Amino acid sequence: MDSPSGSLSPVAIDLAGVSKSYGGKIVVNDLSFTIAAGECFGLLGPNGAGKSTITRMILGMTSPSVGKITVLGAQEPGQVRLARAKIGIVSQFDNLDLEFTVRENLLVYGRYFRMSTREIETVIPSLLEFARLESKANTRVADLSGGMKRRLTLAGALINDPQLLILDEPTTGLDPHARHLIWERLRSLLARGKTILLTTHIMEEAERLCDRLCVLEAGRKIAEGRPHALIEEQIGCPVIEIYGGDPQELSLLIRPNARRLEISGETLFCYTPDPEQVRAQLRAYSNLRLLERPPNLEDVFLRLTGREMEK
């Protein structure tokens, strides 16, 4: 997908010089980004970075102190109703009635948008198929697995056929199989032209799904770009994780062959274009465990913020 700056794709979301303060504390600071229609854009950042506040402003739930936000052609918050009718929301926690069946929960979702029962019943079969819940239509939600509940929540967010989906930590707490099934469903939505704004702590999720992403720290944008471009720009070489020794002592030994070194807890991260030379330097330390791997978004986050993403 072409980037918004170089394409004629319609703009789904535009933030221009947006800041937000609460009680004199700046929680979002001069933030600007544009999301093209049909792309998946990720917001990455530690707790307190401003992700939730940004989402609330996009939804018109709070107004920016400074700057302008436009969503699906409507300027928030004054035209919020025009935009909200075209937005589906998946919050971090399932908003389901456990005593209702799967079908009944979808009926409730539809009524939020003032859809008639006939209209809702018309779309329920396709939503059940999308969520892979055809055989669970009359099952109580309390009897579903965690992955099934998340797929039902996602299906509910699609009840009004939204142009834009806002997903807050959509796979947190799921096992790998359930997580991959959600990712597959989200990719199918992108293939249908839906726009997705994704906030996540899961770096693999961001790397797999996002066309572009924005890394936040203390309310400021510290990086923006395509995942693999950011990895190449910020890291650009293999990584060796070193466990079992004194990180400070080991860093002095291997520094001449390292492009950069990072210490996180008891782990030494060595970014090096010459992994074999580093391994040779460490052979005398029999108690060490080494993991050599390609760089990833977790490394980018550590590089930019100096700390790991909270789990």
UniProtKB/Swiss-Prot annotation:
PROSITE patterns: ABC_TRANSPORTER_1, ABC_TRANSPORTER_2, NODI. One of its GO terms (cellular component) is plasma membrane. SUPFAM superfamilies: P-loop containing nucleoside triphosphate hydrolases. InterPro entries: AAA+_ATPase, ABC_transporter-like_ATP-bd, ABC_transporter-like_CS, ABC_transporter_ATP-binding, ABC_transptNodI, P-loop_NTPase. CDD domains: ABC_subfamily_A. It is found in: Cell inner membrane. Keywords: ATP-binding, Cell inner membrane, Cell membrane, Membrane, Nodulation, Nucleotide-binding, Plasmid, Translocase, Transport. Its EC number is 7.6.2.-. The keyword ATP-binding applies. The keyword Ribonucleoprotein does not apply. It comes from the Bacteria. ATP binds at G45, P46, N47, G48, A49, G50, K51, S52. Its main location: membrane. It is a peripheral membrane protein. One of its GO terms (molecular function) is ATP hydrolysis activity. Residues 13-243 form the ABC transporter domain. Disulfide bonds: none annotated. Part of the ABC transporter complex NodIJ involved in the export of the nodulation factors (Nod factors), the bacterial signal molecules that induce symbiosis and subsequent nodulation induction. Nod factors are LCO (lipo-chitin oligosaccharide), a modified beta-1,4-linked N-acetylglucosamine oligosaccharide. This subunit is responsible for energy coupling to the transport system. The complex is composed of two ATP-binding proteins (NodI) and two transmembrane proteins (NodJ). Belongs to the ABC transporter superfamily. Lipooligosaccharide exporter (TC 3.A.1.102) family. This is Nod factor export ATP-binding protein I. The gene is nodI.
